[in-house]
Amino acid sequence: MIAHIQGRLVEKSPTDVVIDCNGVGYHLHISLHTFSLIPNSENIKLFTHLQIKEDAHTLFGFVEKSEREIFKLLLSVSGIGASIARTMLSSMEPKQILQAIATGDVVSIQSIKGIGTKTAQRVILDLKEKVLKVHDLDEVSMSSNNTNKDEALSALEVLGFNKKLAEKVVEKIARENPDATIESIIKQALKNL
């Protein structure tokens, strides 16, 4: 119904903003990710999602269209409401959420406040196929220019480890410690394989 709002930024906090658009102040709920991307300029544009309930019409704002799409995907899961979806986007980067869903990383999703094991599993079960198809992700590892990760992976293959299993372990290590050296990735992977 309302695709985006463009106007003068009147108020800004980590959870919401007010945008003056031709004399009307729109209150939008935002994630911490969006908060970190909102420029300090006077005029801004946020992509929106309007949630209509019996007792309220609530606007959610996003700097990036991709974050809005992930928000909508999360809302499609039974047991995930707007506040939990917003908490997820505040706790993890949108790319991290997609990666966790694509790789079936229940632990990462479960680490978000308000999400238990069953809900995390449901998120993965309901969204994995959509995420892999729509966002064109490889099921095991998303494309990354991390040469340390690639070299560590090839070293583990030379040592005789299963490629898919090694990829999962190396991907997890690289996600937790993006600046890890080849040696530290291999050492940690050997402990986990």
Task: Name what the model sees in each region.
Residues 161, 167-193:
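C-terminal, charged interaction/regulatory segments at domain termini
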Residues 57-62, 82-101, 122-135:
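Amphipathic, charged-and-aliphatic alpha-helical interface segments
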Residues 77, 91, 103-104, 130-137, ...:
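Conserved, well-folded catalytic cores of nucleic-acid-processing
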Residues 1-76, 181-193:
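Structure-specific DNA junction-binding interface
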